[in-house]
Amino acid sequence: MSAAGSAPVAAPAAPVPSARPHTVRPVPIDELAAVLTTEDHPFDVDHATAVTGVTLRASDVHPGDLFAALPGARAHGADFAAEALARGVAAVLTDPEGARRLPPDAALPVLVHPRPRAVLGAVAAHVYGDPTADLGVIGITGTSGKTTVAHLVEAGLAAAGRTTGMLGTVGIRIDGRPLPSAFTTPEAPDLQALFAVMREAGVADVVMEVSSHALALGRVAGTRFAVGAFTNLSQDHLDFHNDMDEYFAAKATLFDGRAEHAVVCVDDIWGARLAARVPAAVTVATTGASADWRAADVGTDADGGQHFTALTPDGPVPVRLQLPGSFNVANALVALASLAAVGVPAGLAAERFAEVAVPGRMQRIDVGQPFLAVVDYAHKPAAVAALLDTLRAQVPGRLITVLGCGGDRDRGKRPLMGAAAAQRSDVLVVTDDNPRSERPADIRAAMLAGALDEPGHGELHEIGDRRAAIVAAVDAARPGDAVVVAGKGHETGQEVAGVRHPFDDAVELAAAIRGVITGVLGAAR
């Protein structure tokens, strides 16, 4: 290591599974205008046009679409109206500035709204027939744990024999079938179209991760939630939100009447604060706080998993997880309480939990090496601390951590992540994550500054090349140690200066281990 109203019509053909429903009812433009009309913003549109889809990307316009021309950071969507017209757009939704930018010869109806993004979700939901009225949507929000809770809920719904859709960080699935990854973080029109696709496919319930960005930017507007679930809150996304209070306020909007049921983990002060704002919420706790759902008799299994007893309103339920860490006990309780809210008994759901593994979340890599190797998505200070604390309790030897921070994101968390990792690692290798448009060395320097400020920190190394950093960590490992590669988890690419390069931590870690094993065997021969 180196130191330092009408009959349905067929929608345009698309790949199966489709990102749009196969059939839609043409919606007259005056009907859409009525959806948008308020006392402050009346609409009076006299036009025979009907809409059969919604998009905010001119390049994705299908004939009959409503094109949402929204203002952006670099350009206004209305500047691309000519392309939308060439593709057969039926109508435009935009703001006053967008209306001024439209081609003067654009002979089509234009709906002008002062905040078109705020109403886009409701418009798209109406065009696609209000799909979530027919779906049980379970929305999960929080800084950490959303993906794990989503996978556990999906497993519980499957145990109950219910056809399920899932939207989250690791992708989108309909009854187990993946959809293209480009739709992993859907904008409002894409989201409502996906819900309609799921309804067509016979889906009964949808599990959805709900980010603070999705809430603040109106991406889930027009969505009816059967359950809103809150896991926890810690520092992240302060490049988007001004402070933690604003970050919390964005998360809390999921519980402002959008969800029929609320489930809140009160293990941190933010959860307790949210529960106080939502008196009808079902509460979950693992820390001794008073709650409707609690955990008891938590123990570790020989294979690294764990077990506990869920103390539910209907009595105790035994739970086993292959996922280690106290935070996953909380995640499992949130999942069980959310499932109970939609009629799935905790005992039935818990039977499936032991089978759940989540890509890039405490993912073990085993190719026969005499040390533990783990890939995890931890990319915020609290998550790094929780990950390493969990592994420290399991590992007799040293903790060797490979960690970086993403560029063009919350800069304030970089020294905090460096400190959290340095405090808990015997060896910390600071490397690149997704630098994006930033200078990678600057990101590493911020992390190292935090690490160096941590009293009693372990060995510190800086290796910018992530592949080389992983190889160096593996090369340093001895029997009984643990090598932890954190920050990217399930991701299969690394974003550098506008280019996405193929890179998978799990693949790279396995390859590095095989290389070391082969080298050792070769030397022995």
State each model region's role.
Residues 72-75, 358, 384-455, 465-466, ...:
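Active-site beta-alpha connecting loops in nucleotide-dependent enzymes
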Residues 32, 65, 84, 123, ...:
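Residue-level signal for inorganic ion chemistry
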Residues 72-74, 212-213, 234-236, 268-269, ...:
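Short glycine-rich anion-binding loops that position phosphate/pyrophosphate groups of nucleotides
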Residues 86, 90-96, 261-266, 400-403, ...:
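Short internal beta-strands
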Residues 1-122, 296, 324, 358, ...:
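N-terminal leader/targeting and accessory segments in enzymes
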Residues 98-104, 208, 225-373, 450-451, ...:
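Acidic, Mg2+-coordinating active-site environments of NTP-dependent enzymes
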Residues 119-266, 270-279:
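Phosphate-binding loop of NTP-binding sites
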Residues 482-515:
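Glycine/aspartate-rich loop-and-adjacent alpha/beta segment that forms the canonical ThDP
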